[in-house]
Amino acid sequence: MRMKGLYVVPLLLALVESAQKSDLGGDASAALINHSPMLIHRLQDLLQNSNSSDTTLRIRTANSNEVKVIHTHQLLLTLQSDIFEGLLLNQSEVTLQEPAECAAVFEKFIRYFYCGEISVNLNQAIPLHRLASKYHVTALQRGITEYMKTHFASESSQGHVVSWYHYALRMGDITLQESCLKFLAWNLSTVMSSNEWVTVSDNLMVSLLQRSDLVLQSELELFNAVEEWVSKKNPDVPVIEKVLRAIRYPMITPSQLFQIQKKSVVLASYHNSVQDLMFQAFQFHSASPLHFAKYFEVNCSMFVPRNYLSPSWGSQWIINNPARDDRSLTFQTQLGPSNHDTSKKITWNALFSPRWIPVSLRPVYSESVSSSSQSNRLEEGKPRLVMTSAMSGMDFAGVTFQKTVLVGVKRQQGKVFIKHVYNVHQSTDEVFDFLLNADLQKRTSEYLIDNSLHLHIIIKPIYHSLIKAK
């Protein structure tokens, strides 16, 4: 990818452009003659012409005798980097020690100072970001961060988001850390089946397992993936115990719990570490949640479902040509994860409107208002999604329902990646600000895959503590 834009234009050209605009004033006959592309081309030629340079950079790498020599110009380096300004004070030749991966892209990094443009691929993102951070080239640092945040879903043989997270952690880049964590959490099933999974660090694994917004098929899938990670990474015993205790066993069916008790090698070795949680899970499945809540604390993460994609928790909804008209969907979910409620289902109705306008803002029809202006007002409406229970008369004592909507925005190798997650407050049926900035009219919209809107609705029961039985 080639990064180019105003935020990476060299300071020299920005100052020239500002002066030119000032010269025009308000004269209607004035015109701007723009030869900045020619200037950029000539600046790039300077980098190739060592005869005109006034500065020499020598790039060395550890455990190597190779030295890369780059002839540059002090003015262009110091305009954008206070680090170079300090290094080149009263000297024209500097030797720099860089890791091999940074040395490999150093000439590309220097070329950026001459043209304000740089091409980036997945493998080069970290070394270029490291150089931009080290030499305080702020605009380039921001640009590469944005590149990374928009390329999480890009195809990569070994995966790259986990390594980007670990890099952001070392650099103290909180924004990039959170963006990486969010992508990993929302696309965990894909990550768990990739080569990246075994590269997850102990701390990252613990951080992920503490989250309730993980998107995956089931809690059993998560347990199996964690067991694989433990077997291949062989972390310290406290880490193994911590990740095993982060599994939400009540979200696994009794038959599946019996199965992992019998077949799991890791669980057999660390059964004592989770014995209390397994016993509590079987108790949870043996009684009604209402009765269970009288004796046990259910207002904790162990009893909060994650974003499970299996049919009993919700429904996929692919809306073709979503800008065309209103659509509706009816689906069923289980009342809750407790085995006691296996046979109990709830029916839900979902309504999607591509251009909804609140009644209070709708124009009152009259003969004085043209039909075209009424039509234009409708075009100004925003997408709306409402989800309601078709069984509102039922008594759901001790439980409310968290509605979550996943929006898939990109497909790689036939897989839809989740980029947007909307959580609906338990007291309402509407998803506020749903696709607020989406243009569903454009076939190239990032929200559409083959002109279809890919949604997945998840209904999660949230249990509430009741008065304890004496």
Curated annotation (Swiss-Prot):
Its main location: secreted. Keywords: Secreted, Signal. It holds the Pfam family BACK. Gene3D superfamilies: 1.25.40.420, Potassium Channel Kv1.1, Chain A. GO terms for cellular component: extracellular region. It is found in: Secreted. The keyword Signal applies. SMART domains: BACK, BTB. Residues 53-122 form the BTB domain. The keyword Secreted applies. This is BTB/POZ domain-containing protein 17. The gene is btbd17.
